[in-house]
Curated annotation (Swiss-Prot):
Protein name: Histone H2A.2.2
Sites bearing N-acetylmethionine, chain numbering: 1
GO BP term, pick one: heterochromatin formation
Domain notes for this protein: Contains 2 SPKK motifs which may interact with the minor groove of A/T-rich DNA sites. Phosphorylation of this motif may regulate DNA binding. This motif is reiterated in both termini of histone H1 and in the N-terminus of sea urchin histones H2B, but its presence in the C-terminus seems to be unique to plant H2A.
Length: 151
């Protein structure tokens, strides 16, 4: 390159095409904003100092949890033959997963409803017997045999 053809720009040696900025999210291969999370960590005054790896790690953890919940909620929506995830699907996804259920045990999801559950003791006996038969293999009915008469 000929230096005489390029204009001199204030603060830089020569002007020219600007480099595309590479964010820390791109470097880490994440979708969640590492810079914004770092700013929140500093502003929140959780500690006097924040290490450079802390926002990257936190962004990765948050992204993983979000992806996990969304995948399970998408499966719940598909099971209900719906194409849109609603709070009910989020609740079903979280409560039916053991680890997420423990993590979010004290969390109330607005408009999520409750997990359907009926205690077997409260079910009518006929329904309970049918449920038991459905659970086990149905056997073919045997011919009734008379018991011997007592003399």
């Amino acid at each position: 390159m000929d230096a005489s053809k390029l204009k001199k720009v204030a603060g830089k040696k020569f002007g020219g095409p600007r480099k595309k900025s590479v964010t820390r999210s791109i470097k880490a291969g994440l979708q969640f904003p590492v810079g914004r999370i770092g700013r929140y960590l500093k502003k929140g005054r959780y500690a006097q100092r924040v290490g450079s790896g802390a926002p990257v790690y936190l962004a990765a953890v948050l992204e993983y949890l979000a992806a996990e919940v969304l995948e399970l909620a998408g499966n719940a929506a598909k099971d209900n033959k719906k194409s849109r995830i609603v709070p009910r699907h989020l609740l079903l996804a979280v409560r039916n997963d053991q680890e997420l259920g423990r993590l979010l045990a004290g969390v109330t999801i607005a408009h999520g409803g409750v997990i359907p559950n009926i205690n077997p003791v409260l079910l009518p006996k006929k329904a309970a017997e049918k449920a038991e038969k459905a659970g086990t293999k149905a056997k073919s009915p045997k011919k009734a045999t008379k018991s011997p008469k007592k003399a």
